[in-house]
């Protein structure tokens, strides 16, 4: 999936997450996580984000994650919404998911 533009998904409310994405000129993934629960769940948050990016074959992006204690399902939903917005597609290819 090609990320074409800046996009934001989520809020800074307790129990939610705000994620910002921007395209990069390289194929790197620049992931910055700021979380109120980073000591306990930082690695799990990072793993979830990288799993979703891998599933949709996303590379060459900068991600800024401001987590306020979001559950894993919320993190995934926000990230998938963000990818759809940033790539300019109306919906993700659900039928291709495994």
Curated annotation (Swiss-Prot):
User: What's the superkingdom here?
Assistant: Bacteria
Q: In this entry, which stretches build a coiled coil?
A: none
Going by the UniProt record, its keywords in alphabetical order are: Cytoplasm, Phosphoprotein
- The principal location of this protein is cytoplasm
In the UniProt record, does the keyword Phosphoprotein occur?
yes
Report if keyword Phosphoprotein is assigned: yes
Subcellular location as annotated: Cytoplasm
**Assembly and oligomerization:** Oligomer with a subunit composition of (alpha,beta,gamma)6.
NCBIfam families per the UniProt record, alphabetical: citD (TIGR01608), PRK13253.1 (NF009726)
Q: Which family does it belong to?
A: Belongs to the CitD family.
Protein name (Swiss-Prot/TrEMBL): Citrate lyase acyl carrier protein
Which organism encodes this protein? Salmonella arizonae (strain ATCC BAA-731 / CDC346-86 / RSK2980)
């Amino acid at each position: 999936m090609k990320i074409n533009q800046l996009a934001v998904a989520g809020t800074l409310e307790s129990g939610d997450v705000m994620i910002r994405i921007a395209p990069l000129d390289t194929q790197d993934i620049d992931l910055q996580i700021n979380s109120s629960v980073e000591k306990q769940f930082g690695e799990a948050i990072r793993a979830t984000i990288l799993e979703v990016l891998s599933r949709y074959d996303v590379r060459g992006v900068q991600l800024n994650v401001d987590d306020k204690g979001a559950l894993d399902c919320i993190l995934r939903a926000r990230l998938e919404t963000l990818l759809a917005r940033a790539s300019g597609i109306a919906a993700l290819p659900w039928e291709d998911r495994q």
